[in-house]
Amino acid sequence: MASRPSAAKKQPAKKAAAPAKGPVKKAAAKKAPAKRAPAKKAAARKPAPQPAPNPTNGVYRLVRALWLGLAHGVGAVFRGIGQGAKNLDPAHRKDGVALLLLGVALIVAAGTWADLKGPVGDLVEILVTGAFGRLDLLVPILLGAIAVRLIRHPEKPEANGRIVIGLSALVIGVLGQVHIACGSPARSEGMQAIRDAGGLIGWGAATPLSYTMTDVLAVPLLVLLTVFGLLVVTATPVNAIPQRLRQLGVRLGVVHAPETDEFTNDDERYDEQWREALPARPRKRAQPAAAEPYDPDAAEQEALSRRRGRPRRSAVPQPEMNRPMDAVDVAAAAAAALDGAVLHGMPPSPLVADLTQGVSTGDRESTTPTPTPVPAARPQPGKLKKDATKAAGGEPAGGAVPDLTKTPLPKERDLPPRAEQLQLSGDITYSLPSLDSLTRGGPGKARSAANDAIVASLTTVFTEFKVDAAVTGFTRGPTVTRYEVELGPAVKVERITALTKNIAYAVASPDVRIISPIPGKSAVGIEIPNTDREMVNLGDVLRLAESAEDDDPMLVAFGKDVEGGYVMHSLAKMPHMLVAGATGSGKSSCINCLITSIMMRATPEDVRMILVDPKRVELTAYEGIPHLITPIITNPKRAAEALQWVVREMDLRYDDLAAYGYRHIDDFNRAVREGKVKPPEGSERELQPYPYLLVIVDELADLMMVAPRDVEDAIVRITQLARAAGIHLVLATQRPSVDVVTGLIKANVPSRLAFATSSLADSRVILDQPGAEKLIGKGDGLFLPMGANKPTRMQGAFVTEEEVATVVQHCKDQMAPVFREDVTVGTKQKKEIDEDIGDDLDLLCQAAELVVSTQFGSTSMLQRKLRVGFAKAGRLMDLMESRSIVGPSEGSKARDVLVKPDELDGVLAVIRGESEG
């Protein structure tokens, strides 16, 4: 009872306090923004109880770490092996594939022939027997044959695709027929029934045909597929089946071989070579070579068009030569030319008369007898002109190229040997040397691991220097590889050229040459030397189809350019050439290839040569060849006289051209052969075709030191006028300075070939531009023919001394040389007439010209102008006094000049011994 009142008293107090809650809350709400009570921190969670340590966890971690370490180690080993296999030589890869096939063939043979037990035997039975059925015994033989072919012919990878397609068609066709012959078992009869027939391959080939059409139609279709596969494997077109069967009969002795000459056999080998599939070319549609019917003529035209689709390797297209190479009877015509009848008061050229002497009876008896083959047919000039027109075409259109290589290696093929017999006299025939005298070179590389590494290095350089450029491709040559770099938008070409030293540092090669841009392309070229250089053999260049089809006797093989194409050019179209380079740069090899090319293609009736060799050792191998018009000249003074004789010969030829109204010696020779040109009535002269005259000076510097004025005047006159007369000049020097290769000589010698030089100044003297100082030597050169804007980098061809000796001996056996006695006879007369002059003839001529032109005879002037000493100047003045050019000495006064300027030519002629007065 006492507790209830207290409770009652408490309840009103609660009610009284209740109305006061509202205002209090509002007041609290107003004060809340001013001061907020801090939030209570969450109670910290108690840490979970740690489990007791388990001893097996440490073992697990140890095992896991060991396993991962082992996996990483094995992976690193295999990655290293894979990287090494990637850099493996392609020949080793091919050998590895062949040996792998031999191993597989051995395992399959053990499983099918010897009933191998174990898991491997069961696998062979499941795979091989299940796939090939009853013919599983032939699978090891097939694999072994493929492996043997890969080992024996690793250089013909282009035929692998054709053989795979042919074998596939052959196997499918045969197994399909076997399946039908065994009753066409179905899958419902069990796998063993299919194995006893044609296997899964035969079941898959025959079942659809038998289901959709009867076996009567399925069997002929499978037979056609088999025949097609056989033809593709043997590379035999349908129209050549009778010929192949005939050849097979001849080999087996069933059919007698038809009587054919060596040229027919060469043509058969020529066609046989073209039946091989052509390699897959970039920018061409990808299609197996055996998927089209084969036409030999069409294949030949297609191959030539592919080669001529890109610009000819020689910088100027080769037009046709209007000089038929048929057999010509020279003896009777040249004998009549010896009569020396005068035409319009001008004697005939004595050069034509040499060919009548021919080979004496003793020479013919002493020489080795040669068989007399039938003359080979020559291509028609019209066809050559048409082919030359095609050769001027542009780049073939095509799609993208999967790899970076731009130009594949040119496909070589065997050609009929050039053994044309040309009649040089009544009973003597001249046989050109065979191409077998020149060795073949090895197959070139289109790509190597070093090229890929350089591409990566170039890309790294562009990335590091923040140049928006990318390597889009490269073309590999025998000496250097040219990498094509395309620039991004608004990127200056100078940014690439400024990185020359950085690029050289990145690729570890100091000889880096940048071409900006590549002619005909919107790309910058970076030429970097190859670490594995290739040899370019002269025989490979002369075996090309273009060389065999062109009848130009002046066509010369120079080498191979940076794109892998062979460089050939006609000296008749150049028309004169300057070859220069430092010692060891390849200049002598170039001269050897030039002379050997002429001997391989031209007879002495076509080309006569004058060789000047002041060194006495460079051209001695060619002594005695019938193409020479005079023995090899080693005396520089006699060389100057020979050049003067060439000028006189040129004038005689021009007299004939002017008299008969022809502008070029080729037109005149053609008219003579066709009988359109006849001497005037009463003349006993019989006109003869003029041969080309090739003058080769091996060292121009030696000539310029002995007789600079006479040599320069003769060279300038020859180079200015001799092209139309069929006279061509090749000048070689290893000191291309301005006092040797003068401005007048450069102005009249349009074609240049520069090998490695020692300075930039020498490069400018030869090419009028830099570049030769960056060449790497040993045949690496820059070829600038007439009409080209920029030089072409090439690797000069090489011919060994043994090959030169073989060709020279063949030419000597055909004909003995017939020399001219008047080529250097002027020197003997000069010594007899001017004995007191001695070796001062050139200085005396210069002194006389200086004194007469200035009308001032002073010894001190001669010292200053001619840069001679007082004794030499006084002797020159005495010589001029003895020839009445100047008067006697009058002390310190100048001597009187007794000759007027208009009489200077006569005075110089008297000094040189050209006149008796």
Curated annotation (Swiss-Prot):
Its main location: membrane. The chain crosses the membrane at residues 65-85, 96-116, 126-146, 163-183, 216-236. It is found in: Cell membrane. It is a multi-pass membrane protein. The keyword Transmembrane applies. GO terms for biological process: cell division; chromosome segregation. It comes from the Bacteria. Homohexamer. Forms a ring that surrounds DNA. Essential cell division protein that coordinates cell division and chromosome segregation. The N-terminus is involved in assembly of the cell-division machinery. The C-terminus functions as a DNA motor that moves dsDNA in an ATP-dependent manner towards the dif recombination site, which is located within the replication terminus region. Required for activation of the Xer recombinase, allowing activation of chromosome unlinking by recombination. Belongs to the FtsK/SpoIIIE/SftA family. Consists of an N-terminal domain, which is sufficient for the localization to the septal ring and is required for cell division, followed by a linker domain, and a C-terminal domain, which forms the translocation motor involved in chromosome segregation. The C-terminal domain can be further subdivided into alpha, beta and gamma subdomains. The alpha and beta subdomains form the DNA pump, and the gamma subdomain is a regulatory subdomain. This is DNA translocase FtsK. It comes from Streptomyces coelicolor (strain ATCC BAA-471 / A3(2) / M145). The lineage of its organism: Bacteria, Bacillati, Actinomycetota, Actinomycetes, Kitasatosporales.
